[in-house]
A protein has these predicted regions:
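Carboxylate-rich, polar loop motifs that coordinate divalent cations or form catalytic acidic clusters
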Residues: 1-517
């Protein structure tokens, strides 16, 4: 059995390598966290990982800090955070976290574990009080904040000075901004994409493509990321657009409402939309579209409306949605294929996998404690229902004896299934000496000599092929035999519950018991 498990592990590793070369074979498995796991609310607008590794999630009802095990929730009711609707998150060079809300900005000090309202007055007397759409910084570590109805602010921490731009311009609200050297790019709500000098001493200029078209006119821009080859990617109401800043040429990559963007690698752009998650391969322009499946799938996306994306320090992707909370795609999920129960599909029948066994044709028989026995074809990667009636739950042991599969169950005794004839037999505990000593089968081992040992919760049995019955090994009476293994010298080892380890040497019929001292 142990050799089989090692073989299976290597086989799974091989399967894991193949999707790297063949994009068609990639499967995406997500781990969902929502209010059932302690999240304060399921609408996740903002995601941030701080320098200590904590994950922060801004929701419509509270700020959440996740340590990998549990959530800590900050609200105005239990902290100095003055608002519960979190709209923006940013960590500055000092490690403080700036929190934008629907009514101002607050700063979290991780040393003091406290919040302070950012009440700095600007050069024109303005204090940030409205809906914050974004917080970022420039190369000089100045903090930039865009606010509905109040324009764009620039806070210079070294000077303690707050500047307010566009406050009296009559322009629509700034939804997104980014700074590239001395140039500030601004997306105005349902208006256009503009650029100007970062000191705002020059008028705003609308962006035009190489043909002179204002392609973002009347659009709503939600997100922007910089990519390879001096390209910028814009997420908007009208879709996903690539801008080559060297040539001025643009490409429309998607024609759906896009809210969030995140590069997973230089050539793989994750796109959060109202219609699900798109994974765009910039090398070959191939798109993988993931949505909530019709059938129940515990590892699928939890919601199609994606509002935020974030890549953590380990390369995992965090996905915030409108109704479904958080979906996490860790890097290790890409290493292995995952098989689990999916209602309405020919899938693995249970979640609690107990045993593996390979037959002569290379099929894998998988015993589960909550769903019975499964047959898996590694070539087609398909599951077949067990041909033996009654084995729909609690399989605890499997062993192959030529073309006969032996199946040990909890409380239902022992089954044998001839895989060629499909004939089966059922063995139960009896009063006679040549019957099983218990119906709770926990372990089995077929030795190199062809002997089949069956461990139960109350002892050990040896199957007699010629007489089709059993010999009870009284040396192990009353002992819970948890596992059985044959070593390279033909010795049989028995792992027990609370009785140590037994070694049996069949050559001289000797036993030795090893216990802790």
């Amino acid at each position: 059995m142990k050799r089989l498990i090692i073989k299976l592990f290597l086989s799974l590793c091989l399967w894991a390598v193949l999707p790297v070369c063949a994009q068609d074979a990639v499967h995406y498995y997500f781990r969902t966290m929502d209010i059932r796991n302690g999240l304060s609310q399921n609408t996740v607008y903002q995601i941030l990982q701080d320098r200590k590794g904590f994950m922060w999630f801004g929701t419509k009802d509270g700020l959440n800090r996740y340590d990998g095990l549990s959530f800590r929730i900050y609200k105005k009711e239990n902290s100095g955070l003055g608002k519960n609707f979190i709209t923006a998150l940013y960590e500055d060079r000092r490690g403080n976290i700036w929190i934008g809300t629907d009514g101002g900005v607050f700063i979290y000090d991780p040393v003091l574990d406290s919040f302070t309202a950012f009440d700095e007055a600007s050069d024109n007397g303005s204090i940030i009080r409205d809906f914050v759409t974004m917080i970022g910084s420039d190369e000089d570590d100045n903090i930039w904040i865009s606010v509905e109805n109040q324009g764009l602010f620039c806070y210079k921490p070294d000077e303690g000075r707050l500047l307010n731009h566009l406050h009296d311009s009559g322009l629509p609200n700034v939804t997104r901004f980014w700074l590239n050297g001395n140039t500030c790019w601004l997306a105005l709500y349902a208006d256009n994409l503009y650029y100007t000098k970062a000191d705002f001493e020059t008028p705003l200029q609308p962006f035009k493509d190489a043909e002179g078209n204002e392609i973002f006119k009347n659009d709503i821009i939600n997100w922007q990321v910089s990519g390879p080859h001096n390209c910028v990617y814009i997420a908007s109401l009208n879709g996903l657009t690539e801008i080559n800043q060297t040539t001025g040429k643009t490409r429309k990559l998607l024609n759906t409402y896009v809210r969030a963007l995140q590069f997973k690698s230089d050539n793989e752009l994750w796109v959060g939309a109202e219609s699900g998650l798109y994974i765009y391969n910039l090398t070959n322009d191939k798109i993988t579209h993931l949505t909530v499946p019709d059938q129940d799938d515990s590892y699928a996306l939890s919601d199609n409306a994606i509002y935020s994306l974030y890549k953590d320090a380990e390369g995992g992707i965090w996905i915030g949605s409108y109704f479904g909370g958080i979906d996490y795609y860790p890097t290790q999920y890409a290493t292995f294929e995952k098989y689990y129960p999916i209602i309405g599909q020919n899938s693995l029948s249970g979640k609690v996998v107990r045993e593996f066994c390979e037959d002569e044709d290379g099929n894998l028989w998988i015993g589960t404690e909550d769903g019975g026995l499964n047959k898996f074809n590694p070539k087609t990667k398909e599951f077949s229902p067990c041909p033996l009636a009654g084995l729909h739950y609690n399989v605890h042991a499997l062993s192959m004896d030529n073309h006969t599969l032996w199946i040990g169950t909890y409380s239902k005794g022992l089954y044998s299934l001839d895989l060629k004839t499909r004939r089966s037999r059922h063995y139960l505990m009896g009063h006679a000496e040549n019957t099983l000593n218990d119906n709770n089968i926990y372990s089995m081992c077929r030795t190199s000599a062809g002997q089949l040992y069956i461990g139960t919760t109350t002892g050990l049995n040896l199957y007699n092929h010629e007489t089709n019955d059993f010999t009870r090994i009284h040396k192990m009476d009353g002992i819970f035999v948890f596992n059985i293994l044959e070593d390279s010298k033909g010795n049989i080892w028995f792992a027990t519950y609370n009785s140590g380890i037994f070694k049996y040497n069949p050559r001289n019929n000797s036993w030795k018991n090893y216990v802790s001292t």
